[in-house]
Amino acid sequence: MKVIKTLSIINFFIFVTFNIKNESKYSNTFINNAYNMSIRRSMTESKTPTPTGAGAGASGSAGSGDGASGSASGSASGSASGSAGASGSASGSAGASGSASGSAGAEGSPSTPATTTTTTTTNDAEASTSTSSENPNHNNAKTNPKGNGGVQKPNQANKETQNNSNVQQDSQTKSNVPPTQDADTKSPTAQPEQAENSAPTAEQTESPELQSAPENKGTGQHGHMHGSRNNHPQNTSDSQKECTDGNKENCGAATSLLNNSSNIASINKFVVLISATLVLSFAIFI
C-alpha cells in the first residue's frame, strides 16, 4: 500500500510539472505573437508620415538645382559675350565702333591720349591685334591735315580717323594676325562646346552604374529572402503565408485563434491528468 501511495504521488508531481512546462511553452508563444503584432502596428504607424518628409527633401533638392542652373547660365552667357566682343574687335567695322567708345571715354578725361581704347580680351593674340590697329590710328590723327591748324579734341580726331583707318585696320589685321590666331580666337567659344559635349559623356558613364545598381539590389534581396525562408522553416503555415502576403488583419486573427485552441487543448489535458491523479489518490487512501 505504501508503494502504491508513493508511486501515485510521484505520478501526480510528474504530470503537474509536465503540464506546467507545456503551459509555459504555449504562454511564451502567445506572448511572442502579441509582441510581434504590436511591433507590426507600430511599424505601420511609423511608415505613414515618412512620404511627406521625402517630398520636402525632393523640393529642397529641386531648389538647389535651380540655383545651379542659374549660375551655369550666367557663366555661359558671360563667356559667350566675351567671345563675341573679341570677334567683333577683330573685324574692321566693329573695331571702328570700339574706337568710338574709346573716344567717348576720352571726353570724360581730357588728359588721356586720343587713341586710348579699353579692350578686355582673354587671348594675348587678340590684344596684339588691337594694339597694332591702334598705332596707325594715332599716326593718322597726328598727320591729319585738318588737325594742323590747332589741337583737335579726341572725339573729333577719332571720328575723322575712323573712316580712314577702317581699310587699314582690315589690311593690318589680315597681315599681322597669322592663321593660327584665328583658331586661338575661336578657342574660347570651342571650350564651352567641348564642356557641353563632355557633359553627356559623363551622364552616359553614370547611366550604366545606375542601371546596374537595381539589379544588384534585386539579387541581394532575392538571396536574402531565400536565406530567411531556409533558416525559418516553421513559417510555411497558412497563417504565416497570409502574413507574408500582406493580409495583416487576417494574420493576427489566425495566430490568435491557433493559440487559443492550443491553450484550450493543453488546459483539457491538464484537467484530465489532475482528475486521474485525484481519483487514484482517493482510491488509494480510502
UniProtKB/Swiss-Prot annotation:
InterPro entries: MSA2
Keyword Acyltransferase applies: no
Maturation propeptide residues: 261-286
Subcellular location: Cell membrane
Residues making up the signal peptide according to the UniProt record: 1-20
Biased composition (Low complexity): 69-137
Disulfide bonds: C243-C251
Main location: membrane
Any one GO BP annotation for this protein: cell adhesion
Gly residues biased stretches: 54-68
Membrane topology category: Lipid-anchor; GPI-anchor
Coiled coil: none
Residues covered by region (5 X 10 AA tandem repeats of S-G-S-A-[GS]-[GS]-[AD]-G-A): 59-106
Keyword annotations: Cell membrane, Disulfide bond, Glycoprotein, GPI-anchor, Lipoprotein, Malaria, Membrane, Merozoite, Repeat, Signal
Keyword Repeat listed: yes
Pfam families (alphabetical): MSA_2
This protein's GO CC annotations: plasma membrane; side of membrane
Region feature (Disordered): 43-248
Residue numbers with lipid attached (GPI-anchor amidated asparagine): N260
Positions of glycan attachment: N22, N36, N163, N235, N259, N260
Placement of Sequence repeats on the sequence: 59-68, 69-76, 77-86, 88-96, 97-106
Function text: May play a role in the merozoite attachment to the erythrocyte.
Record comment regarding domains: The N-terminal region appears to be involved in lipid binding.
Name recorded for this polypeptide: Merozoite surface protein 2
Organism: Plasmodium falciparum (isolate 311)
